[in-house]
């Protein structure tokens, strides 16, 4: 399974690199354009994620056997999860000026995925990369090289917070063959 071991978050930097006010403004401006089509964008992200990384589907009993992207696109469960993902990102973006709120939201996401769903933390990093690709392809007029760098910084911070929650709940390192 991706050759990843549980505990992938143990090489975490001490803290996430903070966003400047200008970077927060860039994120909020570009997100406004994305969020107008949040469900469709979220569905595109999840479909590409599952097509390119089919091992991620193991965590979704409702659509883990779907192979066809068109079938995935019609799945109400996939659409529902896409909305949840996009709404979580929206909450982060809307609260960039409130680091405690961002930390709290991402801690809840991380703990749920670690404890309840047992999702390997590396999938957050992978999904972030997929999301950045989809956003830059679907919104090229807004996602310039500079904007992509700012969003990469945000996604790194999201990953840092989520993996912090994994560490907090005692995510243990085990052999990847045991996963």
Swiss-Prot record:
Assigned EC number: 1.14.12.-, 1.7.-.-, 1.11.1.-, 1.15.1.1
Q: What GO terms fall under cellular component here? A: cytoplasm; nucleus
Q: Name one GO biological process term.
A: oxygen transport
Span of domain Globin:
18-167
| Enzyme type, top EC level | oxidoreductase
Pfam assignment, any one: Globin
Superkingdom is: Eukaryota
Q: Which reaction does it catalyse?
A: Fe(II)-heme b-[protein] + nitric oxide + O2 = Fe(III)-heme b-[protein] + nitrate; Fe(III)-heme b-[protein] + nitric oxide + H2O = Fe(II)-heme b-[protein] + nitrite + 2 H(+); 2 superoxide + 2 H(+) = H2O2 + O2; H2O2 + AH2 = A + 2 H2O
Does this entry carry the keyword Hydrolase? no
Keywords, comma-separated and alphabetical? Cytoplasm, Heme, Iron, Metal-binding, Nucleus, Oxidoreductase
* Gene Ontology terms for molecular function: heme binding; iron ion binding; nitric oxide dioxygenase activity, heme protein as donor; nitrite reductase activity; oxidoreductase activity; oxygen binding; superoxide dismutase activity
The record, for InterPro entries, names: Globin, Globin-like_sf, Globin/Proto, Globin_lamprey/hagfish
Cellular compartment(s): Cytoplasm; Nucleus
Residues bound to heme b: 81, 113
Could you describe the subunit structure of this protein? Monomeric.
- Protein's job: Probable multifunctional globin with a hexacoordinated heme iron required for the catalysis of various reactions depending on redox condition of the cell as well as oxygen availability. Has a nitric oxide dioxygenase (NOD) activity and is most probably involved in cell-mediated and oxygen-dependent nitric oxide consumption. Under normoxic conditions functions as a nitric oxide dioxygenase (NOD) but under hypoxic conditions the globin may switch its function to that of a nitrite (NO2) reductase (NiR), generating nitric oxide.
Tell me which family the UniProt entry assigns to this protein: Belongs to the globin family.
Protein's name according to its UniProt entry: Cytoglobin-2
Q: What species does this protein belong to? A: Oryzias latipes
């Amino acid at each position: 399974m991706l050759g990843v071991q549980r505990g992938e978050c143990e090489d975490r930097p001490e803290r996430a690199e903070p966003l400047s006010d200008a970077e927060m403004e860039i994120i909020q401006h570009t997100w406004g354009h994305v969020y107008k089509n949040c469900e469709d964008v979220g569905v595109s992200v999840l479909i590409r994620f599952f097509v390119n990384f089919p091992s991620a589907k193991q965590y979704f009993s409702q659509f883990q056997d779907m192979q066809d992207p068109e079938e995935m696109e019609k799945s109400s469960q996939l659409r529902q999860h896409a909305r949840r993902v996009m709404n979580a990102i929206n909450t982060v973006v809307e609260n960039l000026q409130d680091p405690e709120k961002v930390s709290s939201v991402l801690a809840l996401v991380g703990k749920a995925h670690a404890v309840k769903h047992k999702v390997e933390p590396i999938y957050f990093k992978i999904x972030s990369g997929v999301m950045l690709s989809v956003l830059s392809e679907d919104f090229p007029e807004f996602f310039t090289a500079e904007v992509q760098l700012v969003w990469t910084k945000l996604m790194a911070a999201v990953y840092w917070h989520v993996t912090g929650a994994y560490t907090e709940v005692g995510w243990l390192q085990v052999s990847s063959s045991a996963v």
